[in-house]
Amino acid sequence: MRLEGKPVSDEIDDTRRSFSSDPSLLVMLYKPNEGDLAYLRAIERKGEKVGVEVESVEVKKTLAGVDYLHNSTEHHSGVIVLDSYFTCGGLKQFIPSEKDVDGANPRSPWYSATADAVMEILDFYGVDLEGKHVVIVNRSRTVGRPLAEMMLSRDATVTVCHSKTNRLRRYTSMADIVVTAVGKGPLFTQPEDFKPGAIVIDVGMDKDLRGDVDFEACRVENYATNKDVGAVATSMLMAHVKEA
């Protein structure tokens, strides 16, 4: 069964109300790749649908971006920075915590929209995490770590791996649920990569917008693609903006 993102996204759009009369989001881009630009387009479409004004600006230098942040954040409910050039830090560390709607920094009151999206998908389709063995192939502060924290709070047994983990498939092939977010193209291409009946959620996206998993080659029955996760992530991002 495909865990489609659209019905999850639609439910979030319909039920999450704004605490502000005029919610707005500032999207800053620094050396954006194709994935960043695709995400921006999705954010703009979603903002138009749910009534969140979206302003985007691309900065060429970090210092210029810091200045823009300091001068512009007070005019927006939330701020996100799309800067895949940096794995951490960069402009994101200068976002005020109360405006940090994508959980870029530890003091943010929100998890990242992507991490929340994975949990929303699992909840929507009635996946009980208690007692399940979950393997997360990502150790980042915005995806892997918050997901591990949330899943542990649901009494799952969580193993966190990454692209450098030795014999990675030894872990994924034993998991009840796999969430992968490497973003370097097809990483899993064999039926042996996952056990029969496992749920596989692909969050990864490379420069050609390909995910981490070749679902057909792996013969995965229960799955969500990066497009499914992306659809829910944009809805969760807008929900965070409405809460800010």
Language-model features: where?
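Short glycine-rich anion-binding loops that position phosphate/pyrophosphate groups of nucleotides
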Residues: 82-87, 142, 183-186, 205-207, ...
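Anion-binding alpha/beta catalytic cores of soluble intermediary-metabolism enzymes, centered on
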Residues: 2-7, 70-129, 185-188
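Rossmann-fold NAD(P)-binding glycine/threonine-rich loop
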Residues: 91-103, 196, 201-244
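Short beta-strand segments enriched in small/hydrophobic residues
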Residues: 23-31
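Redox-cofactor binding/interface segments in oxidoreductases and associated redox assembly factors
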Residues: 79-81, 180, 201-202, 234
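Glycine-rich phosphate/diphosphate-binding loop of Rossmann-like nucleotide-binding domains
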Residues: 30-44, 62, 112-199, 213-215
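Positively charged, low-complexity intrinsically disordered leader regions
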Residues: 1-22
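Active-site cofactor/substrate anionic-group-binding motifs, chiefly glycine-
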Residues: 34-74
